[in-house]
Amino acid sequence: MSDLASRITAPAAATPATETDAPAAASSTLAVPDGAADGANSSGLQESNYDVEVQLGDPDTDSPLSSISSFSELGLPQGIIDGLLAMNFKKPSKIQARALPLMLSNPPRNMIAQSQSGTGKTGAFVVTILSRVDFNQPNQPQALALAPSRELARQIQSVIQSIGQFCTGLVVDAAIPGAISRETGVKANVVVGTPGTVMDLIRRRQFDVSQLKLLVVDEADNMLDQQGLGEQCVRVKNMLPKTIQTLLFSATFPDHVKSYAEKFAPQANQMKLRQQELTVKGISQMYMDCPSLKEKYEVLCKLYGLMTIGSSVIFVKTRESADEIQRRMEADGHKVSALHGAFQGQERDQLLDDFRSGKSKVLITTNVLARGIDVSSVSMVINYDIPMKGPGDQSPDAETYLHRIGRTGRFGRVGVSISFVHDRKSFTALSSIAEHYGIDLIQLSPDDWDDTEVKVQDVIKSSRAKPDYAPTQEKAA
């Protein structure tokens, strides 16, 4: 078979199809992942070979610019130190070493922080939350964390409870649909929730925000950029005390969102990375050259039929596509699950819990799980559909690509991402994303499964990620 690059130079030979088409009536998008640090001599996080760039919101202040080498330098309560050690966070990651002195300074200052997936940003803001809370007031809300999905909110709640397990008096509520009783309202000193539910609780006077000291917005670029979520975040912020400390965290901050974030968190200290430093080095990024849209599904089943992959996530574009691929894969003898926004809250919780525990090994999902969710056992992510944005999917979505592949290669482990391309549009979109981040993509061919298996297993069997890791074969851009 001729490769895709040659086929797209002769459009007549390619199958004219759009990304809204599906594998025999399927379509596409979704994602997954959880985890505490594993690790031997440190937190076990994905460490970088670059320095974090810091910009002070007010250069005239005496904000600390130093980088800590141990958590003990921060003067944290012993309960937090014990919790970090219990979670195997033995020393700060680079993002934690630079961010924590700034976030814990007094008087409190706002922060806009950008860091790769799996580098410890959640741990950084969780330590800040626990440090700001008076545990003698277990039922008085003092810190609020906002997340774009119930899955991520539940995960953050779990991390706070784990690191804060020795903090007597810590109570963490999840403000997600169906979780807070209308009779009791919020009775916790830390609240993690989605913007719509939080806003509703405040309006019904079931969430006392008068003593809130800290607001954290995780996956802030997505939260502020989406019309509905962005408006809800602003409304929630306007209901909170004017003196509240605001922390915005994300792996990506597109320019148009960055200016909005600076208004949302004024005079914020900022931490950022250069564009080419955003992709996680422990992820070997590949692409599969599929003969046509129809044959994408056959290639997918062949991939899972030949290899022992472990936990993996398949991202598709639509709910219908996720359901159709699940139906067809199960009919072909594969054990898979689908998770997307059409499922009710408790059912979504159970599906994700089953995936975390290993009861389910393959999760087909849309972008509802592309951000923040950590399942440390995920060794492969498949972009069945290349992420696109704009009316009619007019342009590639580089930020969503980065968040999707960040579901693997967590906490210093290695991982594989495989993006499926089948025509001029999908190939051009992936090429644009690769150029955007300076990625050398490794080509896989459905005509040589022995070679494909060697390349993929070469990565998965590697014990830990190295900064420059890639399989030992020729790369193709």
From Swiss-Prot:
It is found in: Cytoplasm; Nucleus, Nuclear pore complex; Nucleus membrane. SMART domains: DEXDc, HELICc. Its EC number is 3.6.4.13. The keyword tRNA processing does not apply. CDD domains: DEADc_DDX19_DDX25, SF2_C_DEAD. Keywords: ATP-binding, Cytoplasm, Helicase, Hydrolase, Membrane, mRNA transport, Nuclear pore complex, Nucleotide-binding, Nucleus, Protein transport, RNA-binding, Translocation, Transport. Residues 1-29 have a biased composition (Low complexity). ATP-dependent RNA helicase associated with the nuclear pore complex and essential for mRNA export from the nucleus. May participate in a terminal step of mRNA export through the removal of proteins that accompany mRNA through the nucleopore complex. May also be involved in early transcription. This is ATP-dependent RNA helicase DBP5. It comes from Pyricularia oryzae (strain 70-15 / ATCC MYA-4617 / FGSC 8958) (Rice blast fungus).
